[in-house]
């Protein structure tokens, strides 16, 4: 795999850049006051990076959290907490219940009702805050300079509008879908919907698929989120206010991706890209782990983690993975919380937790087996480690698909995984492995100049829009096709009814005669 035909060294700096932007948004005399309404779970990991950086620059940060928060601690040297005595709705048990189904479709269906409940509880949390006069008086007297929120839930948006303070997003996903589709022009003719698993180069029927997936997803988002937030916004701001318009009015969108990851697409001036901002150089490993890694010799190590939500796998799948690992000369570090697989080889170490970033940055790491979460994807990009993806839910399938298109990942479907399929994917990536080294800014400029010379251009950075006729760009042909299908179906239905009626009338006439 040729690593970083698309790697951009700016990923080393975005954390500092983003904090600078936030700093410019806040009066700098004695440091600003930031009210944070985060999303619990893995999203808190990258929000915490920004919070710690803001604190280090002298800003005062307050974090709103539910009393049963899964990740967000009540006490911290970097922020003060505003704890609301109400369940937040998302916990580890909720996601583990979802793991009983091991196909993406069935798992999505199991989680749909759960997310409906999560957003209901977020709205209850906001109502409890706004109805607490003493709390709101204290918040107003604090005179926060801005609200920083993850718009995967709408609590921070409503709070910022209620307090009439600037709103900044730490964003990839919103309650209305992927962030770009809420704020920026997104022609469906060449901008793929994440759930469609397509690229920016689509055939006619792929564009039909993209169009249909968009319609279905918008319907599902409105069914899952809409009832709660529409009622909440109507209650406090009036029925004429649309909750999505409050999202679109955000001052700044700090997008947790960049064009290393994204396909070329339109954007907006207030969208700031910070893909990989949470990435950092590797720290030394604990002694026992370092000894295990060093024992791999010239073959190196493979690390596997399916994130915080999926700690264990069904026994049959775990056994197939273990067999495939046992056949390799590499050592394997596998984050796994289930029963020890019966087929586990001597080259595989099971751990409850691993310093993932530090392992990815180790010079002996050869491969990352991952579920495809955004944080892990960017850490792998940052450390130039190729990926074998086992995506299951949320944006994981799309994330891995994007990396596959760029030539740095292989995708394996858990629903069809066996030892042969998994072993083949591992071997293909290991055989093609090539690791680049980090570059200084001048080296980056020279790299891209030479890249364009070597490849006679940089076509992967240009959008497909200029190649498309106007009717394709605006999806006119797709809409005409779908309209034709609908009309044909309707005419066929009318024809069948008419035929049935004519036959009935004919029989009645024959009886009368």
Model-identified regions with their sequence ranges:
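Membrane-proximal helical "anchor" segments flanking the first transmembrane region
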Residues: 246-248
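Conserved, non-catalytic sequence blocks in retroelement Pol enzymes and Pol-derived host proteins
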Residues: 241
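Glycosyltransferase specificity loop/lid
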Residues: 3-235, 244, 254, 261, ...
């Amino acid at each position: 795999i040729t690593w970083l035909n698309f790697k951009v060294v700016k990923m080393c700096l975005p954390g500092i850049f983003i904090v600078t932007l936030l700093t410019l948004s806040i009066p700098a005399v004695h440091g600003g006051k930031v009210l944070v309404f985060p999303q619990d779970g893995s999203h808190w990991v990258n929000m915490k990076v920004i919070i710690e950086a803001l604190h280090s620059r002298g800003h005062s940060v307050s974090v709103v959290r539910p009393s049963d928060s899964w990740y967000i601690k009540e006490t911290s040297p970097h922020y003060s907490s505003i704890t609301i005595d109400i369940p937040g709705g998302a916990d580890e048990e909720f996601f583990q219940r979802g793991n009983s189904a091991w196909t993406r479709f069935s798992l999505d269906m199991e989680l749909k009702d759960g997310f409906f409940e999560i957003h209901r509880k977020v709205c209850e949390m906001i109502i409890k805050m706004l109805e607490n006069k003493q709390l709101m008086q204290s918040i107003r007297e604090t005179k926060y300079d801005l609200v920083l929120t993850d718009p995967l839930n709408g609590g921070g948006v409503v709070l910022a509008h209620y307090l009439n303070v600037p709103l900044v997003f730490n964003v990839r996903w919103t309650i209305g879908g992927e962030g770009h589709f809420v704020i920026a022009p997104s022609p469906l003719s060449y901008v793929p919907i994440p759930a469609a698993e397509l690229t920016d180069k689509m055939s006619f029927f792929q564009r039909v698929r993209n169009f249909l997936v968009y319609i279905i997803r918008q319907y599902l988002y409105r069914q899952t989120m809409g009832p709660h937030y529409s009622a909440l916004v109507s209650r406090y701001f009036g029925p004429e206010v649309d909750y999505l318009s409050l999202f679109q009015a955000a001052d700044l969108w700090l997008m947790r991706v960049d064009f290393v990851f994204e396909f070329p697409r339109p954007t907006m001036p207030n969208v700031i890209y910070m893909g990989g901002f949470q990435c950092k150089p590797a720290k030394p490993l604990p002694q026992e782990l370092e000894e295990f890694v060093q024992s791999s010799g010239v073959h190196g190590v493979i690390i596997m983690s399916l994130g915080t939500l999926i700690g264990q796998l069904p026994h049959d799948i775990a056994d197939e993975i273990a067999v495939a690992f046992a056949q390799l000369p590499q050592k394997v570090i596998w984050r796994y919380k289930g029963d020890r697989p019966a087929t586990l080889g001597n080259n595989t170490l099971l751990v409850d937790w691993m310093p993932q970033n530090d392992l990815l940055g180790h010079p002996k790491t050869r491969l990352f087996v991952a579920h495809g979460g955004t944080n892990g994807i960017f850490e792998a990009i940052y450390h130039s480690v190729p990926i074998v993806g086992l995506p299951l839910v949320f944006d994981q399938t799309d994330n891995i698909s994007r990396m596959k298109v760029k030539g740095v990942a292989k995708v394996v479907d858990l629903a069809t995984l066996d030892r042969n399929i998994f072993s083949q994917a591992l071997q293909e990536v290991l055989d093609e492995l090539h690791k680049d080294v980090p570059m200084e800014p001048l080296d980056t400029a020279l790299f891209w100049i030479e890249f364009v010379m070597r490849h006679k251009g940089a076509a992967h950075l240009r959008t497909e829009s200029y190649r498309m006729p106007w009717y394709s760009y605006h999806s006119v042909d797709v809409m005409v096709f779908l309209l034709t299908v609908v009309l044909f179906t309707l005419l066929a239905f009318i024809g069948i009814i008419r035929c049935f009626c004519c036959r009935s009338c004919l029989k009645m006439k024959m009886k009368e005669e």
